[in-house]
Amino acid sequence: MPIPLLSFPLTTQNQRVEGYEVPNEDTPTIYRLTDTSSDTEIDAIIWAAYRQIFSEHLILETYRQPYLESQLRNRAINVRDFIRGLGKSEVYRQEVAQTNSNYRLVDISFKRFLGRATYGKSEQIAWSIVIATQGLHGFIDALVDSEEYRQNFGDDIVPFQRRRFKDRPFNLVNPRYADYWRNRLLEQFLGGQSFYRVVRAGESGKRGVAGAIPSTFLSMAASIAPSGISYQRTADSARTFISTVKLPETTSESKTPPPTVKPATVALPYRYIPGNKTT
């Protein structure tokens, strides 16, 4: 028997109230599958679903799901099942689920499947328990089969960000992974050691910093060092080079006489009037 979803307090969000904004270029485009949808419209629905769930503006060929696309084109599944399949795909597991903590996975999935952010840490904790007990597939099923999803998107509408007002779109402000996964990759490339851990431990000297750098990097750097005298390595060497270098004499005297300016007659205004002295 699954653990029931924990209760959590709600917070104020734009999507919880009706909007009276005038539609403009920021108004989301609604992609809906109907019985009369053409092949071009179905293609637009498929790519809109990829952008929404995978949050990628440029969909790679390896990210595509041909089996799900074929079923949707033949009306074997609806849009809601297509969204469910994308959430359960190996692409979503590798690119989103495995690169984030359960709390951040909940927040990202809510923005992509339900079109809103979570109501706070309490809701993230409640749904992270669902991930821990039912896995990723159970979590995706719970989102797609929820009453909130059905009321806002039904079976034939691609999810979208609901009532975005002045804020940037979710896919522009939320990178695919946070510092949690970036630091983990850093530790893997550094052979299990992290420069940040070395500094926190108090070893801020050269020995502590060198301990976080693989020995292969030092040998590689030494092998590509330029040969010959490098006067830019230290300030003293640079000053010595500048003080000892002999610059050629480039000054010369010009033999051309300077130009002379002769006075010229100027027609002053009103000189044609008799008796008017203009000089």
From Swiss-Prot:
Top-level taxon of origin: Bacteria
Gene3D superfamilies named in the record: Phycobilisome linker domain
Gene Ontology cellular component annotations, sorted alphabetically: phycobilisome; plasma membrane-derived thylakoid membrane
Record's bilayer topology term: Peripheral membrane protein
Main location, first listed in the record: membrane
Alphabetical list of InterPro entries matching this protein: PBS_linker_dom, PBS_linker_sf, Phycobilisome
Pfam families associated with the record: PBS_linker_poly
Location in or out of the cell: Cellular thylakoid membrane
Subunit structure: The phycobilisome is a hemidiscoidal structure that is composed of two distinct substructures: a core complex and a number of rods radiating from the core.
Classification via PANTHER family: PHYCOBILISOME 32.1 KDA LINKER POLYPEPTIDE, PHYCOCYANIN-ASSOCIATED, ROD 2-RELATED (PTHR34011)
Reported function: Rod-core linker protein required for attachment of phycocyanin to allophycocyanin in cores of phycobilisomes. Linker polypeptides determine the state of aggregation and the location of the disk-shaped phycobiliprotein units within the phycobilisome and modulate their spectroscopic properties in order to mediate a directed and optimal energy transfer.
Family statement: Belongs to the phycobilisome linker protein family.
Protein name in UniProt: Phycobilisome rod-core linker polypeptide CpcG1
Organism of this sequence: Mastigocladus laminosus (Fischerella sp.)
